[in-house]
Amino acid sequence: MSQVNRRKVLFVTSELADLVKTGGLGDVSAALPRAMRHLHDVRVLIPGYPQVINSGNPIHIISQLGGHAALPPCKVGRMDMKDGLVIYVLICPELYEREGTPYADSNGRDWSDNHIRFARLGLAAAEFAAGEVKSQWCPELVHAHDWPAGLAPAYMRWRGQSTPSIFTVHNLAYQGTVSTASSRELGIPDSAITPEGMEFYGQLSFIKAGMAFASHITTVSATYAREITTPEFGCGLEGFLQSKANKGQLSGIPNGIDESWDAATDEHLICHFAPNEWTRKEINADYVRELFELDASTGPLFAVVSRLVYQKGLDLTIGVAEHIVNNGGQIAIIGRGEPEEEEAMRELAARFPGRVGVRIGFNETDARRMFAGSDFLLMPSRYEPCGLSQMYAQRFGSLPVARNTGGLADTIEDGVTGFLFNESTVESYTQALDRAFQVFAHPELLNAMRCRAMAAPFNWHQAVEPYADLYRDLLKKNVSVSSNY
């Protein structure tokens, strides 16, 4: 694309994998702007958490922004990453410089003022789009991600700005709800507190605000875009989303994964390997067994690399664990999450010493080695907007055993690159596992599936082109969805 056609796009996000992340949102927020930079000038706005401020990357203050309602004044700094990606940091120590995650303290308790913290992020994005940040760069389109950035399109609309916006739903279940009593401190107009606006069963919903006031809504897979218009997956917003879909304002664009996920070159692996070099893959398996204190074995090794939350269907994995062990399999589990889920994983490992191992926490190096060393990846998610682990696993020759939902349905070919099951039941899960055991017993079938999985085209090009088309269409119209605000 010629320089004259390059447009200025601001990503608004609460996570960026280079600096701070809790899940896939951080990965996407870091990878997609880089994948698009040959087409557009894409920059990122993120809060100034300690992990950002203390990252070792120089930050140059470029502007100051005043307060609004209960939202405090703040500064905007510019951080230039080594590869050229420009990050704008929203500096407000009273809101962001706290120990813990972007959303919770060190004990896992959500910050009580999250509505203030992320409303300030949304307002800063609107101020950026209005040219109020003293910078030579002003976005022509704002692309906001998930509920923490949900008020970015909303403030833009309430302030009468015509800059188009996109809101991407990464997980509809996390909605950012707060009492309607907070409307005054957030500067929300009464006219926005309606079923067509951000009102949600007597509360205010940040994610609904993003969807209500953005020019267009995207989700991270085509199947999930359809699913969220149904009661099973719509989280109470299915009617609202069906209305958006009917107007052509909802679409699904799949995530990709970056080129570092290559078994032949990944610097994290114990042993590199290529398709058909399965003895070299087994060296990674030996490492995983040692790390998780599993017995030496020639049976299949199943991996769980996951947030430990109800969504991920871990209770179903507990329900099939004995079946896996009785058939000669082993399970290695890594992740962190809800305390009760973490304890359930510890109890599972205690039930099957040497056959099931668990490490509470997350380490990307070990996660990569688990994908490389395992034969199968377990992903019995109740819903999965996109999912990245199943793509990582396939790149490393680990075949997913997963529920047929969301992005899993879009990225796993049943019986070709993995095994899908339809119902969130132990019975349905077990049937898929039995198919996996049957394939494992026939090395020629197993290796053929591994080769096909490793060749699957999970690059960012599949996302870049649809987003580029959407950006072009919105910028051409340069109008937002009709509204009275």
Curated annotation (Swiss-Prot):
Binding site for ADP-alpha-D-glucose: 21
Pathway(s) it belongs to: Glycan biosynthesis; glycogen biosynthesis
Entry's family note: Belongs to the glycosyltransferase 1 family. Bacterial/plant glycogen synthase subfamily.
Domain of life: Bacteria
Enzyme Commission (EC) number: 2.4.1.21
Organism: Pseudomonas syringae pv. syringae (strain B728a)
Function, as annotated: Synthesizes alpha-1,4-glucan chains using ADP-glucose.
Enzyme class: transferase
Keywords of this entry: Glycogen biosynthesis, Glycosyltransferase, Transferase
Protein name per Swiss-Prot or TrEMBL: Glycogen synthase
